[in-house]
């Protein structure tokens, strides 16, 4: 899973990336300090995995991960190649979802490319560039569909749908906002439009905003309103604070967060939100050799989940021995869970649940 962090120059994008990955991306007070996309892999926070590690004392501990890509900033005209526009559009096409960092903090020492802080304007600037790029891509697909229609009338519905999407884009709306049936969703996915990607607006705020209550910030309220229109999620975060606490030990970090009235870091909330945004869940495997979280889509059946470990597991699937995490914790050991009949034997049609602890039986 790959997530692209985007935003106008000097909104705190690279500061947030540094805090997430400790990759040390150069973060400077001028545009385009992130010329090449920096990539970092970060663990998905999961306290269940920690509990299993305490129980099994494994030789290896492997959490689920998300890949973040810090993508170079863009400016007005990016869809026409202005600034680093061509590079930006190329890099953003490769990600599964977008984290759009929006500046909601005031600071005279940090220049804004437009000269003032206005999150609605900033969001609309990037949205416009993505929409313009999408129109160009969609027009090519529409031309192709029109040619196919001349030979086969079955393409009429496809053409009508794409024209409806284009109409939405021309009105400044995202492809994501277009109402679709299941077949139309597949059609839309086949075009790979930028504005169809899932998105989270990371509202980058000051410590003072958090202390005063983020919901009281007019800038945050503006982001919330626009996110609702965009069918997007929104998460308040203080990138500077996250960067400062990223190097602290867990106890110091918790103390710092408590002072801000928070129970978990903004980064943990962001990572969890991204995981949820993409419709992902984790199942767990546990034993002395390794405790591990495996990432799958919601709705995945047991054989396909087994295939995440190895293709042989899916090909030769016999059954899955499954226990719910809470049941295992209540029993204290896997043996006790089996004695109480809490370890279930599930077949090929079983739909995996988040937090399932599984042992797959297979034969090839």
Predicted segments with their positions:
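Generic signal for short, ordered secondary-structure residues
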Residues: 14, 31, 67, 105, ...
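Conserved G1/Walker A P-loop phosphate-binding module
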Residues: 1-111, 139-140, 144
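Short, intrinsically disordered, mixed-charge
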Residues: 22, 54, 90, 94, ...
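Amphipathic alpha-helical transducer elements in NTP-driven molecular machines
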Residues: 32, 46-49, 62-68, 82-96, ...
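C-terminal-of-GTPase-core extension/linker across diverse P-loop GTPases
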Residues: 2-6, 11, 17, 144-351, ...
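Glycine-rich, flexible loop/turn motifs
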Residues: 23-31, 38-40, 48-51, 80, ...
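Conserved Switch II/interswitch segment of TRAFAC-class P-loop GTPases
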Residues: 40-45, 72-82, 93-155, 168-181, ...
């Amino acid at each position: 899973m790959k997530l692209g962090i985007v935003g106008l120059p000097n909104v705190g994008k690279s500061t947030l990336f540094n805090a997430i990955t400790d990759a040390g991306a150069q973060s400077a007070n001028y545009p385009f300090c992130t010329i090449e996309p920096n990539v970092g892999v970060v663990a998905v926070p999961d306290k269940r995995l920690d509990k299993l590690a305490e129980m099994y004392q494994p030789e290896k501990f492997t959490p689920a991960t998300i890949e973040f890509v810090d993508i170079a900033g863009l400016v007005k005209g990016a869809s026409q190649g202005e600034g680093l526009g061509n590079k930006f559009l190329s890099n953003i096409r490769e990600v599964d979802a977008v984290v759009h960092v929006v500046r909601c903090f005031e600071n005279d020492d940090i220049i804004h490319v437009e000269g003032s802080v206005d999150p609605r304007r900033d969001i609309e600037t990037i949205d416009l560039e993505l929409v313009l790029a999408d129109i160009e891509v969609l027009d090519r697909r529409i031309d192709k569909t029109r040619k196919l229609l001349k030979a086969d009338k079955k393409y009429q519905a496809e053409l009508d749908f794409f024209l409806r999407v284009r109409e939405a884009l021309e009105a400044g709306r995202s492809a994501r906002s277009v109402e679709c049936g299941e077949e139309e969703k597949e059609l839309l996915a086949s075009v790979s439009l930028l504005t169809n990607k899932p998105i989270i607006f990371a509202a980058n705020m000051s410590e003072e905003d958090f202390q005063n209550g983020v919901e009281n910030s007019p800038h945050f309220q503006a982001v919330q309103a626009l996110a609702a229109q965009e069918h997007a999620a929104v998460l308040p975060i203080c990138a500077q604070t996250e960067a400062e606490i990223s190097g602290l030990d867990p106890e110091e970090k918790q103390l710092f967060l408590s002072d801000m009235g928070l129970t978990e870091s903004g980064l943990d909330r962001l990572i969890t939100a991204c995981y949820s945004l993409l419709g992902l869940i984790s199942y767990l495997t546990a034993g002395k050799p390794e405790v591990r979280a495996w990432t799958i889509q919601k709705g995945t059946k047991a054989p396909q989940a087994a295939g995440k470990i190895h293709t042989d597991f899916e090909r030769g699937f016999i059954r899955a021995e499954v226990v719910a995490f809470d049941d295992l914790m209540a029993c204290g050991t896997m043996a006790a869970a089996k004695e109480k009949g809490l370890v279930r034997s599930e077949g090929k049609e079983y739909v995996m649940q988040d937090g399932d602890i599984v042992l797959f039986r297979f034969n090839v």
